[in-house]
Amino acid sequence: MDVVEVAGSWWAQEREDIIMKYEKGHRAGLPEDKGPKPFRSYNNNVDHLGIVHETELPPLTAREAKQIRREISRKSKWVDMLGDWEKYKSSRKLIDRAYKGMPMNIRGPMWSVLLNTEEMKLKNPGRYQIMKEKGKRSSEHIQRIDRDVSGTLRKHIFFRDRYGTKQRELLHILLAYEEYNPEVGYCRDLSHIAALFLLYLPEEDAFWALVQLLASERHSLQGFHSPNGGTVQGLQDQQEHVVATSQPKTMGHQDKKDLCGQCSPLGCLIRILIDGISLGLTLRLWDVYLVEGEQALMPITRIAFKVQQKRLTKTSRCGPWARFCNRFVDTWARDEDTVLKHLRASMKKLTRKQGDLQPPAKPEQGSSASRPVPASRGGKTLCKGDRQAPPGPPARFPRPIWSASPPRAPRSSTPCPGGAVREDTYPVGTQGVPSPALAQGGPQGSWRFLQWNSMPRLPTDLDVEGPWFRHYDFRQSCWVRAISQEDQLAPCWQAEHPAERVRSAFAAPSTDSDQGTPFRARDEQPCAPTSGPCLCGLHLESSQFPPGF
């Protein structure tokens, strides 16, 4: 028996053991559970959201009692909207009531209607069961899924018991989605998102809600997880534009301290929506996000910048990422109604200034052609030395800013043999970063975090190990290859020196004294193990690779 067969049998046995523990139920096969021990009595230790507390809860305050009475009075209004959904689904009244808050007993049916889960179930009868069984037999990430399930919402009464009912349902959903969407497969954030759906939806409904959330253009959440998704880069550019125009002092300080790309709150945007804040505020933000769509992402980050403006201007280069993440989470440690009030005001202000994220437009009926790309309306990155261009005329069918190809600016002209001249262009606002479009068929070069939906599919098989990336599979990440400026000049130079080209093919890779490994993480503080993957705060560089890497 060779090594491959031994490894395959070992993985199959490990997968069967994990599945068997969940089938047996609560705390099966674990003599010592590292997680919190479940309570046997939950008399006065559980709040209205289902969070289990260590001590007995105090009596309700006058404000909490008033909020409960308010939810009861609003229930009839939400029931009326669900009964006449065609009338209210695109109305302003739905948005207004979403900011005020959904009653808890209405949240499940409303999420199901917003994500159209019933229609998906009717179109795909029995498919969830098929995907679930296939995932049990052939999942490649079942160990990671099991580890993440064990740490998801453990303070909630539904997920308190190890190998309990809700943990088993969460495992089944993640295994089924890995088989349903191989492009995304499994990412760490998906366990938190699916757990939120399981709080209010049955197992199969929660699965189709997850499918619809990542597949919908309205929410654009797959761009955070897909290898070719450009949501992160588009939000980064849009955020830098909005902050530079509304808070120039804050952006100027970040440019001065070289914090433009390192301290972006978008790196922990997913964590803010699913982890790190109170469950009540998380659900309120999810309500707004499901109703408003991707437009709500930018106002959320803008509020954090506005609240933390004074602290940001005092942030130095020493450990900026860890300090900023802590302060960004502290932004939400306040009253839920106050946060939603500021969020609504920020949404209106950005809409007036045309700084919000435009909702995806619907193409013309009967036409399968792609939507036209509008002129840039302030979507380019504004860093030191850049000036804001006047807004262009809007197109008939606008689309999200990150779906458009980045504007190109000429950088240099390189003479090549035969009299031809190649003009190197870069996206505006990313001067100094080579164009990823040149990476096709070119020599190997440095790695840059740069992605656009209009880019061709590039190799993303980077496999990095280390303390920073212990639980994250970079084959499912958004890292792409780009060519350094030196490598762009290599084809012309090798054409003039054919002997050197042959000699360089057999040259050994260089080993720098300050690089013990091929990759070096530039993040000054590792991501917290409880957070999602920080997609915007890392920067990797490679040493010179041997040919054929």
Swiss-Prot record:
Residues annotated as domain Rab-GAP TBC: 101-293
SMART domains xrefs: TBC
Region (Disordered): 350-423
Further comment: TBC1D3 is encoded by a collection of very similar paralogs with multiple copies of each paralog, some human genomes encoding well over 50 copies depending on ethnic origin of the donor.
Ranges of compositional bias, category Low complexity: 398-417
A Pfam family reported for this protein in Swiss-Prot or TrEMBL: RabGAP-TBC
Keyword Ubl conjugation: yes
The record's account of how the chain is modified after translation: Ubiquitinated by a CUL7-based E3 ligase, which leads to proteasomal degradation. Palmitoylation is required for membrane localization and protects TBC1D3 from ubiquitination.
Protein's name in the database: TBC1 domain family member 3L
Chain's gene name: TBC1D3L
Keyword vocabulary terms for this entry: Cell membrane, GTPase activation, Lipoprotein, Membrane, Palmitate, Ubl conjugation
Organism annotation: Homo sapiens
Residue positions of covalent lipid attachment, annotated as S-palmitoyl cysteine: 318, 325
